[in-house]
A protein has these predicted regions:
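Gly/Pro-rich cap/lid or specificity-loop segments adjacent to the active site
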Residues: 1-210
Length: 211
């Protein structure tokens, strides 16, 4: 059940994690540990009612989890998207059931299971797209929504990342070059980045280990 407090103060807030593919453990752990940036951001939400964090379909602790284990032997080929898809389908997993519409329906089912009249939504990044889908499909479920960093449903955001990154870097380099202090500290920032890209292309290195 949601918080028993009366009026709007008792409406639970459902956190819509971004990604897509982000899990809730990091957020919950950070809040519990008292990380300042999280307590500052979520303190007002926690003060008014319950904060519900969940793992969306296929990620985090939800089952089945859509992931393929990485080989322990670094020389072995990493599983491609195609082979991972085929492996999951062999397990009888219907991948068509993992999308924003189904995630939105899960939130509706969660609201019903909680036995509350209304829910608040807090979405960041992909969570904003999910929030918009919930508002579209179940507007009567929602009392209020915080949409932080809109990911419109009609914009192919993932495919725009390379172009967006190039634009951001170009503007950063131009701004640094136009600033006397920055240009003196980081001369030819654009050229240095190009050299770094060429170096990493020739001699890449592993930054993290993922399972």
């Amino acid at each position: 059940k949601g918080s028993p407090r009366s009026g709007t103060e008792g409406i639970p807030t459902i956190e819509l994690i971004g990604g897509p593919g982000g899990g809730g453990d990091g957020l919950v752990g950070g809040i519990v540990a008292g990380a300042k940036e999280l307590t500052d951001a979520y303190g007002p939400i926690l003060a008014k009612g319950d904060l519900i964090v969940f793992d969306q379909r296929g990620v985090g602790r939800s089952l089945p989890r859509l992931g393929c284990p990485m080989p322990s032997d670094e020389s072995a080929p990493e599983p491609t998207t195609k082979s991972c898809k085929e492996a999951l389908e062999k397990q009888g997993i219907d991948l068509a059931a993992y999308d924003t519409i189904e995630n939105a329906e899960d939130v509706h089912d969660m609201k019903v299971a909680l036995g509350v009249d209304k829910i608040d939504l807090h979405g960041i990044s992909y969570g904003t797209r999910l929030a918009l889908e919930i508002l579209k499909r179940h507007p009567d479920d929602v009392h209020a929504a915080i949409i932080d960093g809109v990911m419109p449903p009609d914009v192919p955001v993932m495919g725009m990342f390379p172009v967006a990154m190039d634009t951001i870097l170009s503007r950063t380099f131009a701004a640094c070059k136009a600033d006397t202090k920055c240009n003196a500290t980081y001369p030819d920032l654009d050229g240095q980045m190009t050299q770094l890209e060429e170096k990493l292309t020739k001699t890449p290195f592993k930054a993290h280990d993922y399972e």
